A protein has these predicted regions:
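Conserved alpha-helical substructure of the radical SAM core
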Residues: 1-100, 112-114
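Radical SAM enzyme [4Fe-4S]-AdoMet core and its adjacent flexible, acidic
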Residues: 29, 49, 72-75, 91, ...
Length: 182
């Protein structure tokens, strides 16, 4: 398998309007559960994808899980709503297993009580620091059909922070605008 999704928690710190949520009992995976699953999954993939219904950065053992993943030879891809990055950035960036982060910028608008500028600043600062360590960061903005009134502002902020030549949206139908490689 190219990657295997592993839900380390189904608990999220937000209640996004576009998310179906879950009715399952709230759960944070234990060290033992993670180690067991990592051992079972090892023969099948090199990539674990911390993603699904919960917010992985809300898990108090995220650093331990990244260390366990590294010890077993995994590379980790993590999807986050970005709101907790200022609190967990040092833990994430110290983890050799972290290969890529996908930051869902559409989470901002689907919630209230989040300061727009602080939120974007935290996500952008993390991506800058991650890139200095060779960690890939992808900004996701896919809230078509949902709350997307600030997409233009978000794209403008991305252009300001990450200057350079950008490819037009038409170059990637149904995908976010991307900076031109190189």
């Amino acid at each position: 398998f190219a990657k295997i999704y592993l839900e380390i928690t189904n608990v999220c710190n937000l209640a996004c309007s576009f998310c179906a949520g879950t009715t399952r009992k709230k759960h944070f995976m234990t060290r033992e559960e993670f180690a067991f699953l990592a051992d079972r999954l090892r023969p099948y993939t090199d990539f674990l994808y911390f993603h699904l219904m919960g917010e992985p950065t809300a898990h108090p053992l995220i650093g331990d899980f990244l260390a366990t993943a590294h010890a077993r030879g995994f590379r980790v891809i993590l999807t986050t709503n970005g709101t907790l990055l200022p609190k967990v950035a040092d833990t994430l960036l110290a983890a050799p297993a972290l290969f890529k982060t996908s930051l869902s910028l559409h989470a901002f608008e689907a919630n209230s009580g989040i300061d727009f500028e602080s939120y974007l600043q935290g996500c952008f600062d993390f991506a800058d620091r991650a890139s200095q360590q060779g960690i890939i960061s992808v900004f996701r903005l896919w809230n078509d059909g949902g709350k997307n009134g600030r997409n233009t502002e978000i794209l403008h902020a991305l252009h300001e922070r990450f200057s350079g030549e950008w490819m037009p949206e038409e170059a990637y139908p149904a995908k976010a605008v991307r900076p031109r490689p190189g």
